[in-house]
């Protein structure tokens, strides 16, 4: 059997064993995708015992490509909602994540001094305990720059391998323990997150109000200050028994009923200056109007602002709201359309059909993947991650690496949406498939590399001590911050799990958190919110610790 065939066969075996382990559940809790790591350790042990040798270069390429696929698809998924989330809750989430990094560094320093753990070993334990491969590489590089013998530098890799599996378990255990301590109902948490999903802080709502302010009588909608901006859309007007689609020039009169779409605070202000909310229905049933959801798939309208399409003037159709990657937005005229945007249209059937033709509304296109933007995004992400950042006083340049670069680039491209006819929308099913493939490849290789010497180090060496130290570095910061976040900040459980996973830059933990409620994007969003800053901190922390410990002896 050729080397390639052998490697692929071993990887397939690891995936089968690992996914089987991950599907085994105890009281509803399982390792999920994290089981692949243990499958790799098991298979790696027997591969080593059998004397088989796999190409280290090939394994390294597969491992890094798997990681790139995973973080890139995560970024594309959460990109559209990432920056809105950052404005609303990003500061709080990042503060908690930074606190986890700081506490982890303090625990590492205390263990190093108390138990006189060799510097390469403690840095490897730290990197494995926080499940951060770039931290391992950064630590090894700084040790080489400081003149540490190669045999000592290699110890960092072994201690990393010992701490890494239990680092993942520690994160999963912390999530499970916090769920038990606070008696969390995951379904309730998902509903609460969905009800509080925001765009600049508020969920989009609709109300019907009656024009009661005499100062608004016989005014055009565009002359009413609260209605002439982009914060509120007036999508329907009912006068006596006639329902119509209003335009900015439509004159409103006392007694008219207006159907308004906007954020709660803005709608409240509208009531103050126009009139009170009423229970009267402004349904289109039984009228010559209808409401329909249409998806943007026509490449010719991508990047164009809603106001520039002149749907009201040309077709007498109003866009009442816009859904982008699950985030509800007020359809203001300045919003540029992206592929996959879902628009609520109000108008006559023939007019809506005409607008749908302009927008595309080709459902089959939503199932197609444009591969060119995928590889452009991955390539740009790798380039971004390879840019060295020179910090005064550091003997080695800092980099985002193959994990941070593609993630940040994907977040940016996901937010931009499209450039010309290139669009970075990815069907959810395709995104999930690439994401799962990437994480399976990554964990399979990590497990295989750890499996050969894992048992010997565990039984005959200092492996148990290293695991214990790693468990402390993993658990103490996570449990401390998890309790603080839940008790003091009243943080949503799913959001907290994503933050904990992101603070450890741990894809398997994110996969586990996502599986707690597959239809909620809370964990992925908070993960991506803290990941960029934490990745940078995780890369420089072992370098800071190395320089600190080296200088004080």
Swiss-Prot record:
Disulfide bonds: none annotated. It is found in: Cell membrane. InterPro entries: AAE_transporter, RCK_C, RCK_C_sf, Transpt_YidE_put, YidE_YbjL. GO terms for cellular component: plasma membrane. Keywords: Cell membrane, Membrane, Repeat, Transmembrane, Transmembrane helix, Transport. The keyword Membrane applies. The keyword Translocase does not apply. Residues 191-276, 279-361 form the RCK C-terminal domain. Its main location: membrane. One of its GO terms (biological process) is potassium ion transport. Belongs to the AAE transporter (TC 2.A.81) family. YidE subfamily. NCBIfam families: PRK03818.1, YidE_YbjL_dupl. This is Putative transport protein YidE. It comes from Shigella flexneri serotype 5b (strain 8401).
């Amino acid at each position: 059997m050729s080397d390639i065939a052998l490697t692929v066969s071993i990887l397939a075996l690891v995936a089968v064993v690992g996914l089987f382990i991950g599907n085994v559940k105890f009281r509803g809790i399982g390792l999920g995708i994290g089981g692949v790591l243990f499958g790799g350790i098991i298979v790696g042990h027997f591969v080593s015992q059998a004397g088989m040798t796999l190409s280290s270069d090939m394994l390294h390429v597969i491992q890094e490509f798997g990681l790139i696929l995973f973080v890139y698809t995560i970024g594309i998924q959460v990109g559209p909602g990432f920056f809105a989330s950052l404005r609303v809750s990003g500061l709080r989430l990042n503060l908690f994540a930074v606190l986890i990094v700081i506490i982890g560094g303090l625990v590492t320093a205390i263990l190093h001094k108390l138990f006189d753990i060799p510097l390469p070993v403690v840095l490897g334990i730290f990197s494995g305990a926080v499940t951060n491969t770039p931290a391992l590489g950064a630590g090894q590089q700084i040790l080489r720059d400081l003149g540490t013998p190669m045999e000592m530098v290699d110890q960092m890799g072994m201690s990393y391998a010992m701490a890494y599996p239990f680092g993942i378990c520690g994160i999963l255990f912390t999530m499970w323990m916090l769920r038990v301590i606070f008696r969390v109902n995951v379904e309730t948490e998902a509903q609460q997150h969905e009800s509080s999903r925001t765009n600049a802080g508020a969920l989009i709502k609709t109300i019907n109000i009656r024009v009661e302010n005499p100062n608004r009588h016989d005014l055009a909608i565009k002359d009413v200050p609260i209605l002439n901006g982009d914060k509120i859309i007036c999508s329907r007007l009912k006068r006596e028994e006639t329902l119509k689609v209003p335009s900015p020039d439509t004159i409103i009169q006392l007694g008219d009923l207006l159907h308004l779409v906007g954020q709660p605070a803005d709608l409240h202000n509208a009531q103050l200056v126009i009139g009170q909310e009423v229970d009267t229905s402004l349904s289109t049933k039984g009228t010559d109007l209808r409401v329909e959801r249409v998806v943007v798939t026509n490449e010719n309208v991508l990047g164009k602002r809603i106001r520039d399409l002149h749907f009201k003037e040309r077709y007498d159709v109003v866009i009442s709201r816009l859904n982008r990657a699950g985030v509800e937005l007020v359809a203001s005229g300045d919003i540029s359309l992206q592929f996959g945007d879902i628009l609520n249209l109000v108008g006559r059937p023939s007019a809506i059909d005409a607008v749908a033709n302009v927008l595309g509304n080709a459902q089959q296109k939503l199932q197609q993947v444009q591969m060119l933007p995928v590889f452009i995004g991955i390539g740009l992400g790798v380039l971004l991650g390879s840019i060295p950042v020179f910090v005064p006083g550091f003997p080695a340049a800092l980099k985002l690496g193959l994990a941070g670069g593609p993630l940040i680039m994907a977040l940016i491209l996901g937010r931009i949406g499209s450039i010309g006819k290139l669009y970075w929308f990815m069907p959810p099913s395709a995104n999930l498939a690439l994401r799962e493939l990437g994480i399976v490849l990554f964990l399979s290789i990590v497990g295989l590399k750890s499996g050969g010497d894992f048992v010997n180090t565990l039984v005959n060496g200092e492996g148990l001590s290293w695991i214990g130290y790693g468990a402390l570095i993993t658990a103490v910061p996570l449990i401390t911050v998890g309790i603080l976040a839940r008790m003091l900040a009243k943080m949503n459980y799913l959001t907290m799990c994503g933050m904990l996973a992101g603070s450890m830059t741990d894809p398997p933990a994110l996969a586990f958190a996502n599986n707690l409620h597959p239809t909620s994007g809370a964990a992925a969003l908070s993960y991506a919110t803290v990941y960029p800053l934490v990745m940078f901190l995780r890369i420089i922390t072992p370098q800071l610790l190395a320089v600190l410990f080296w200088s004080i002896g």
